Amino acid sequence: MFCSALRNILRNSQNAAKNATITSQIRNLRGQQSVHHEVEVLTSPGITTKQNDKKTEPAECEGSKEVALDFRNREAHVPSFNLAAYVNNSSTLQQFLSLGVDLHSIERRKGLGDFVLKLDFEKNVKPYITFLVDQGVSPDDFGRMFTKNPLLFKEDLDDLQTRVNYLKSKRFSDEARQRILTQNPYWLMFSTRRVDRRLGYFQKEFKLSGHDLRLLATREPNAITYNMEHLRKSVFTLKEEMGFNAKELSDLVVRKPRLLMIPPDDLVERFSYIHQDMGLPHAQIVQCPELLASREFRLRERHEFLKLLGRAQYDPQKDLYISPKTIVEGNNFYFVRNVAKSDLETFDLFLKTR
């Protein structure tokens, strides 16, 4: 059988690869030894080196007067106390645990542990639960929402209702509003004016209709409140470095808005492999935006395996066509059985000999 013969070839190449690796390691070891001796001769025992471990991060801002809210990237720190030690004596913490809140995750973010500990469940938490239930949010989502954004309890309830009413005025359906609130608990921290500016930016930048704008915001609510500097860099990368035209860019971000949140360097790396190595044109990439959302090494592994089997055929006008989006669907077992039409043993041997 073809797969059996292929496995024999892969095993032989694997042994050859091992020998080559051993030889390379010996050479590297010899090189390291010689370098080590040189360093010992040149380094004086009285000389010490210092490293500056301080790291600065660029400030994130939306405009000259508005600082972007970045709740997710709060600096992790060693908590001064453990919330678990207060659970037995705090009915609020007990209620949070029953809702599925991850107290350990909260206490690792500076200042939030102390804030949560001071909350009174009946006065400071229960009204917000009632508000969320009225918006159609499922109680099953409370734990994840409060873990991500406990600062929600600082917001005025009237302001929260105003922000929900804004979404209603923009014709977001009940299901869309529920998804936005559960998938992005930080959305309610943004004023209606600020959300309006964000939605306006997306509509103008990508020339979206009202329907497409609502579709984008519902599919990936986090994109609307994401750091503006990052969004602008991603748009520049998609336009100028990858060469998508205005229509292609619009279709791309509506179908997969999460692409705007991926680091631009990663996008370029993936696009380069998809466009040059796999040979897919821009129009086909727009139809399969999942490719750009997948890690480059995963694309490479699966494409090269299909190429080895003679099945890397992505032209729909030819026989044995394979839809590019199926390459990144499912786990390895699904890919090998349903796309490559092979077996895991052959695929594992292929990965070991790469």
From Swiss-Prot:
Transit peptide start and end: 1-89
For this entry, the protein name equals Transcription termination factor 3, mitochondrial
Q: Which GO terms describe its molecular function?
A: double-stranded DNA binding; large ribosomal subunit rRNA binding
Q: Name one GO cellular component term.
A: mitochondrial matrix
Sorted alphabetically, which keywords does the UniProt record give? DNA-binding, Mitochondrion, Ribosome biogenesis, Transcription, Transcription regulation, Transit peptide
Q: Some GO term, biological process aspect, for this entry: which one?
A: regulation of mitochondrial transcription
Q: What is its main location?
A: mitochondrion
To which species is this protein native?
A: Drosophila melanogaster
Entry function: Binds promoter DNA and regulates initiation of transcription. Regulator of mitochondrial ribosome biogenesis and translation that is essential for development. Required for normal mitochondrial transcription and translation. Required for assembly of mitochondrial respiratory complexes and normal mitochondrial function. Maintains 16S rRNA levels and functions in mitochondrial ribosome assembly by regulating the biogenesis of the 39S ribosomal subunit.
InterPro entries recorded: MTERF, MTERF_sf
